Curated annotation (Swiss-Prot):
Region (Interaction with host IRF3): 321-496
KW RNA-binding (keyword) present: yes
Organism of this sequence: Rotavirus A (strain RVA/SA11-FEM/G3P6[1]) (RV-A)
GO biological-process terms attached to the record: symbiont-mediated suppression of host cytoplasmic pattern recognition receptor signaling pathway via inhibition of IRF3 activity; symbiont-mediated suppression of host cytoplasmic pattern recognition receptor signaling pathway via inhibition of IRF7 activity
Subunit comment: Interacts (via C-terminus) with host IRF3; this interaction leads to IRF3 degradation. Interacts with host IRF7; this interaction leads to IRF7 degradation. Interacts with host CUL1 and CUL3.
Species lineage: Viruses, Riboviria, Orthornavirae, Duplornaviricota, Resentoviricetes
Protein's recorded name: Non-structural protein 1
Region (RNA-binding): 1-81
Amino acid sequence: MATFKDACFHYRRLTALNRRLCNIGANSICMPVPDEKIKGWCLECCQIADLTHCYGCSLPHVCKWCVQNRRCFLDNEPHLLKLRTVKHPITKDKLQCIIDLYNIIFPINDKVIRKFERMIKQRKCRNQYKIEWYNHLLLPITLNAAAFKFDENNLYYVFGLYEKSVSDIYAPYRIVNFINEFDKLLLDDINFTRMSNLPIELRNHYAKKYFQLSRLPSSKLKQIYFSDFTKETVIFNTYTKTPGRSIYRNVTEFNWRDELELYSDLKNDKNKLIAAMMTSKYTRFYAHDNNFGRLKMTIFELGHHCQPNYVASNHPGNASDIQYCKWCNIKYFLSKIDWRIRDMYNLLMEFIKDCYKSNVNVGHCSSVENIYPLIKRLIWSLFTNHMDQTIEEVFNHMSPVSVEGTNVIMLILGLNISLYNEIKRTLNVDSIPMVLNLNEFSSIVKSISSKWYNVDELDKLPMSIKSTEELIEMKNSGTLTEEFELLISNSEDDNE
């Protein structure tokens, strides 16, 4: 039985604040929602279930019941999931705020127990104190939290009562315990005080549950990668040829400087929290999805679908425009891909084609060449530490000759103006040389691959990990979407 879910169901009738905070989706009607086939704890109701992706952060951390409420731990609306969320670093004051939160929302005292007794003993068969009827009173205060690690300094902890055990290898979070950062004896005393108000029949169950959960060892934190995010929230703009992502957040006009101020209002100004929840709006943010994780994924797919036969062909057009040649056609893949990747692929394949045909005697794209597997490896190695080694292998497969102790290859360019300008810019020359050494060849390949992408400035993960305040600020400043999305292509092929 999910004690936290039961506590939310019964305690929601206690106060006006509880009616807002304890209204979770797990206690409502289930709606059909596809799940991610990942078993884990739902962060809103703390029960073990099949998880589905959240519309706020695109990570699977809610069950098919709670996803109906559209709540995310990155919202700025002070709902219960947000109140249980603490950002790194963890301090003793923040842990004390979590304990105060439990005592305010889920108190255990004589008045509360008598009220629940009157509610439960409406039937004659419910005179005894059985766990099935009083499970909501067996809610110990623990400092276990689900930890999300976006990077070394960007971590979020969602505190809750995570009962039982489950293999969370595919879940985006790990369960950690902060009892040592607080004070074991002090936390024991807090729970013993709560337990002393319970009927004798329930105290043993409370104590057993508390000691089992409060002494759990912490799991090793899991680094979140791009593959952990769902594809359901990704939107490909066919007009601008750029990927984007829909992010939905609960936004309120009330602001708090930090978490401590929010918890202070929870204790001293509950009406402010109620007003914030009543006036919050479910807001959609459309953000670009240009990040290093997506770049690596797209490069991997490009290498898989790449047709290296193009470097031996006589096609006059770009590699992405070939559609009637069974050895070179890749248009089916590039029709829904970022236009920058498409441009990079065209320039890279054209450059290798010009170099290869200038040095090796080849006839047609149907011929079998030893360089084909290397071209796939070259694309896969872009933006990795193996790039220099692969470029050298490609260079050595173009029959270089030694001139004064330096291996060089010939270069007879075709009619690609974009490639011509790119080589001039890279080598900083007025006219294109007809002979290239390894360093010049490598510089051109790296320049083509990094023409549109500065890896050092790219975020590692999607924009959906940003806080709601950051999204609002970026939207107001116009940086939520890219400047490239204003690009209008005049290519007849792009407008088909």
